Every structure is written in structure tokens, then in C-alpha cells.
Amino acid sequence: MTKNLLVELGLEELPAYVVTPSEKQLGEKMAAFLKENRLSFEAIQTFSTPRRLAVRVTGLSDKQSDLTEDFKGPAKKIALDSDGNFTKAAQGFVRGKGLTVEDIEFREIKGEEYVYVTKEEVGQAVEAIVPGVVDVLKSLTFPVSMHWAGNSFEYIRPVHTLTVLLDEEEFDLDFLDIKGGRVSRGHRFLGQETKIQSALSYEEDLRKQFVIADPCEREQMIVDQIKTIEAERGVRIEIDADLLNEVLNLVEYPTAFMGSFDAKYLEVPEEVLVTSMKEHQRYFVVRDQDGKLLPNFISVRNGNAEHLENVIKGNEKVLVARLEDGEFFWREDQKLVISDLVEKLNNVTFHEKIGSLREHMIRTGQITVLLAEKAGLSVDETVDLARAAAIYKFDLLTGMVGEFDELQGIMGEKYTLLAGETPAVAAAIREHYMPTSAEGELPESKVGAVLAIADKLDTILSFFSVGLIPSGSNDPYALRRATQGVVRILDAFGWHIAMDELIDSLYALKFDSLTYENKAEVMDFIKARVDKMMGSTPKDIKEAVLAGSNFVVADMLEAASALVEVSKEEDFKPSVESLSRAFNLAEKAEGVATVDSALFENDQEKALAEAVETLVLSGPASQQLKQLFALSPVIDAFFENTMVMAEDQAVRQNRLAILSQLTKKAAKFACFNQINTK
């Protein structure tokens, strides 16, 4: 016979960004708890609103499965003394398992007998295990927590109710000074406290109190309501996935509605209006059928449709205040002079240990000079890049960006166009922030891409130089994201810029404001980001590519992909083993690896030397790998007929030199002795 378990925790309003991860965590930890306690179940469903986290287990076994465990103890010769009596070692072993020496049996393993005991544990009824759900709730982790009411404990928010039901049976459990039962809270304004009748009636009991506990159902309600408004008004409404997820975690009973604002505000840049609505007010944007922004918005109230006209007016009033600010800053910022703002950046601190934003821009400008040549920018592109680098942070001192910091770069583009700068300069100012997340949009223009790389590289090198290096999960200055951005942009544009050579060039630069330090740490940090970009590539293949001598990001990613592609083919293992043997022996070479043909003693030696001399890796990675694997028979013949470590030192070094030249060329692809072929 199976049962159904419900656990609900009622809390003060949770931050929207915490709700979904906490709901998921609760489900995962409940599943782990049941598995650990040998309780089978059919399904787990989680629930969440801003004021509750809940989980329901259906088809739950009514008792634990019985447990039979075998334990291996000491060898028989240690377990028995000369008289055949059990020693203290044997007695202590069984006592630790809660058994006696009568339970001992001997089993033979590889010719020797050992003590074994079998422990059997009869499963308990599920009712005896349910109180352990309190520990599940205690084990939840949150990004922030708080104390309340003078208590010593802390949690994400104050706890008000705990509901634990096994079918209709309630459990009177204690959690953070709250006594459990079957009482839950309805909607803050429309509902009231209610008794949950059973684990299976949970959603319906709360629905009567204007709470939709299932977030998927709430989401669908919001989408359906928006689609209805869309059809009735003949408009297009952008349902942004991130905004939708946030809104559904702000409401327990959603009702969507349309509001409006004065069309005069449409003269303000669209990005300002969209930011005001989406980022600040959590409104959905409304457009006409051609995609043109309309003076309307969609909001979702936490409640029903009663007195909705008052709610609409209130939301419109709040938005207008935001739009007034945007209109004011748009008008006033156009009176500012870009060069004046750039000069004022001398007084804006980039970081107290590093210097001003203006100094950061100057260093970035010098880096762009190096990158422009390596990226093959045209003369016109180089001119635009220099101009963009000279002014690209100016918009940080505009009123608009001061009020709406999400618009940095975006407003820079608009203000530079108004000031008569070229579209390429304006676009680069917007694009230099890209990507803004791990999978974020990348720059489209070469000028913007180079400026983005240069800005990020100076940021990384500057922070590393003053010892502000990320450790563990701690990365307050988002240096991992910046490095990932550099790597992604280089790969996307296919620029064959060797990162080790580039970093060497940057460390050779001289600045009045800062001296770059900690180069080795920077290189390791960049390699770690390339490693991350390789995704699920096997660890040994990653290590082989990263240990190679080619640090062109696009080449490294292509090499890793090519190795994975052929790793299941028949010739992969023998080819890699041949190259690995060459790599391992080449490490013994001394001095400059020059080959003297006069010292050859067999045809196989000569054949390998000639093959290595004519080897030029070219084309895509898959083709280069075929070139290297084609050497496998020649390498094998060399090893079968040649004593590499000959007694004659000159002969030995000559043979090591052949292998050294081979591995030097192969290392441009990967260090094959890092690949596991077992």
C-alpha cells in the first residue's frame, strides 16, 4: 500500500530570484532523503509562490525496504588466536556492527579467509521516517539569510507555518520555533488561513483562498491572459522569458492588465522606455503588428480583477514618474560635451588600487593598437577604433546612465551619433560591454570586438597585477566573465591571435599608471576559460590541447573537437600511443635538437627523420590529425628497429633529436602523452 506525503513551508515574501532555485532544491533534497531512508515513491512534485515552498510525494511506500548488508572484517589468521578463540580484533569488529562473534562466518577471497558478518535491518513504517523532513528543510541553502525576533537561528525569511501531511494524517513537528500541522495561509489580501484536508487536496484547498501553488499553472495563466489582451487589442506583446519567470514569482494569484502612457514619451529612445518598463517596473512591452513600440504596457497584479481600474491608474502614475526622468535626462545630456566628460573620468575611480577610469581607458587604447594589427583591421577601422577607445566610457557620467545604469554603452552609442561620430565608433562603444553574460550576445563589428577584448584584457591584467585574483567561487570583479568574453570573441571572429604571444606583448607595454604583474597566473586563468569552453570534452583531451604549444583559441577548440571526433575510431588508440611514446622519450633530449644524418644506423631511423622534416601541419584540425596519425607506422617501425637510448651518447642524442623535432611539431596540435588510451 502506498501513501502521499505533503510538506509545505509558509514564509514571509521571498525575493523573486530565490523562489525557483529553492523549489528545485527542495525537490532534489527530498528525493535524496527518501532514497537514503529506503523509501520508494512514484513521483515528486514541487510547488512555490512568493510565500511558500512545498513538495508532494505520491506513491510513497508505507514502509522502508529491509536492509541486508555484508561487512568484511580482519583475516582469519588475525581473527583467531592459536587456540582458535576470537581475538580482540574480531570481537571489536563485530561489536562495532552491533553484532556478536556468533554472527561471524569466514569467506575465502583470493586464497585467504576473512571474517564476514551479515547485518539485517527490518524496515520501519513510513510514519517513523516522516519527522526527518524537518532536517530536509534545515538543509536548504540560500544566497542570503536573516535572523528575526531575537532568535539565534537564521533562514531565508521568517517562517510562519509548517504543514506536514501523510494522506490525511497531520504531523505535529517543530521547525524554527514553528509548530507543524495542517494549517496554511491563503492570499495575503483575498484569502485567509485554511486547513489542508489531505496531501492530494493541496492545490484545490489553496485555490479557494486565491493561491495558485503550482508555478507552471501560474505561468500559463499569465501567458493566456496576455494572449487574450493581445487578441482583443490587436497588438503584439513581448513575453520575455526572464521577466515572465520573475513576475510569476512575485504573485500568488495573477491577473494581467494593460495600461498606457502619453505618446509624447515615445520621442525618448526606445531603450530608455523598455528599460523603465521591464527592468524597473516589471512590465511587458507592447508593440503594433509592425513591431513599433506603443504607449502601452502589460502588468500583472497579485490578485483578482476587482477594482482593476484603480490598479491600472496606480501603475500608470508610477511609470510616468520614471518616463519623466528619462525624458529629462535625454534632453539635458544632449547639452554635454563628450571631451569634457572624458576629462572628468580622471576623477572617477576604476579601483582604488588600480587608478582612475581615464587611466584604464588609456591602457585599453594602447592595447587596441596591438590588437588592430593582429586582427587585420583596415586603415578606416583602425581610425574608428582609436577614436572609440579615446572616448568609450564617457556616457558613465551622463544623467541617463546615472539613473539607468543598464543603459551604459547603449546611450554612449546614441550620444556619439548625435555628436557626429561615425556609426562604427558609436557601435563599438555599445559593443565593448559584450558579452554581458556567459552566453550573452557578442559584438558584430570588428572595431567593437577589438575594443571589447582590449577593455577586458586591461581589466583582467590590472586586477591580477594588484593581487585581486579570483579564488574558488569568489569573483567580485567578474574577471571570469571578462576572460570568457575574450575567449568567445576570439573564437567567434576566428582571429588567429596566439594568447601567449599577445600576453607577452601586453606585459612589454609601459604605462605611467600601472605595471602589469603576475603573468603566469593570468595565463593559467585564461587557459581555465578555454577549458570551460571545451564543455563536455573528456578531461585528458582538454589537458592534451591546453598543454600544447598553440594558444590560438579557435585552433585549440577545433583540435579538441577533432580528437573527440576520432576517439572512437580503430586507429585512434595505436596512433596516440605511438605519438605518446615519442613525447615521453623526447623529454630526455638535451640542448638544441639538431639531427645529423651521418649518425643514422638503419633505414627506419632515416625514414622517420625525413618524415618529420617534411611534416607541415596545415588545413583544418581534422586534416592535421590525419597527418600526425599517418606517421604512426613510421614511428612504430623506428621504435621496433632502433634502440633510442643507445650507449653511444652522440647516437642517443641524435635519435632523441628526431623525436624532439617530431613532438615540437605535434605539440602545435596537442601533447599526445596527456591522452589516456587505457
Swiss-Prot record:
- Which example biological process does GO assign this protein? arginyl-tRNA aminoacylation
Indicate yes or no for the key word Transit peptide: no
EC assignment: the record states 6.1.1.14
Q: Does the keyword Cytoplasm apply?
A: yes
Q: Could you tell me the keywords of this UniProt record? A: Aminoacyl-tRNA synthetase, ATP-binding, Cytoplasm, Ligase, Nucleotide-binding, Protein biosynthesis
Output the InterPro entries linked to this UniProt entry. Answer: DALR_anticod-bd (IPR008909), Gly-tRNA-synth_bsu (IPR015944), Gly-tRNA-synth_heterodimer (IPR006194)
- Swiss-Prot/TrEMBL catalytic activity: tRNA(Gly) + glycine + ATP = glycyl-tRNA(Gly) + AMP + diphosphate
| Record GO cellular component, one term | cytosol
- Which Pfam families would you find in this protein's record? DALR_1, tRNA_synt_2f
GO MF annotation list: arginine-tRNA ligase activity; ATP binding; glycine-tRNA ligase activity
**Where found?**
Cytoplasm
Alphabetized PROSITE patterns for the sequence: AA_TRNA_LIGASE_II_GLYAB (PS50861)
Query: At the top level of its lineage, which domain of life is listed?
Result: Bacteria
Q: Which family does it belong to?
A: Belongs to the class-II aminoacyl-tRNA synthetase family.
Q: Describe the protein's quaternary organization and the partners it interacts with.
A: Tetramer of two alpha and two beta subunits.
Query: Under what name is this protein listed?
Result: Glycine--tRNA ligase beta subunit
